[in-house]
Amino acid sequence: MNQQQIDEMYMRRCLQLARNGMQNAKPNPMVGAVIVVPSPYRGETEGGSIIGEGYHVRCGEGHAEVNAFASVRPEDEHLLKDATIYVSLEPCAHYGKTPPCCDLIIRKGVKRCVVGCVDPFAKVQGRGIQIIREAGIEVTVGVLEKECQQLNKRFFTYHQHHRPYILLKWAQTANGFIDDHGQALALSTPYTKMLVHKLRSEYDAILVGRVTDEREHPQLNVREWYGKDPVRIVLGKNTQGESSTSSPLWGNREGLQSLMVEGGRQTLQSFIDAGLWDEIRIETSPKTVTGGTSAPQLPVGIQLQQEQFVDGNIIRTYRK
């Protein structure tokens, strides 16, 4: 393997570790870190050997780098001078609930630092990388960059666009209706329903329109997966009777990094028409009805990102 392939291999491990923080790291990003020493120290493994690894378990506790260094055995500490630390997100450079990770990396004296992507948080934004480089440590940035950014898509959207990452989600019949002449339809299978609850556990808030709330009284909580219930939001009407998608809810001050919209057609279409979406998830059942409410109209030129066949249903995902 060449160096790029080695770097990508260990960055994939960082991403794998980072995902373990999905539930408890919020509102912090998910981050994984791996410490690697050259092959001669640990047999003949091509590309080196891991002597430490960790991930950000819970907001307010040690970051991935802290946990990775803590996992290094005392008898391996002397190897750090020749080690490379891989981190899926730029090491922090500020004092928050924990000290700066860039200072820890410098203090441990590693030879090289490989970073997946730059942290968009205003107090970091390249400062961690700069500090580490100024200390004489070699830094490589941008290894599996898109994958690292995608892992924390909600965190990135919140800090770059000052609004939540917005997922629009609905289920429809094979002939494009979301209800049966105004009556609710059971279109998900037990398994795809579980997937929806898993999604809910990953989002900070979930929103429906007033009409859906009054007609269906949805619980909008997490029942068939584990994790916290999202904040429940019912989108009301302003004085002109229009959907209030310009509400201060979308402001940075609310602290919501992600929002799932499960409303009826009017609510979903208002988000689409306003361009307030990042991802659209549509579950299509093989069932058909003779009439009802038509599914929302997708934006012109939208690109399909993923298509899954699950229990006879088709789940399509679109992203901007």
Language model feature labels by segment:
Residues N2-P29, G52, D76, K97, ...:
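Enzymes that bind and transform nitrogen-containing heteroaromatic metabolites
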Residues G32:
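Helix-turn-helix
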Residues G142-H159:
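Short, structured interface segments
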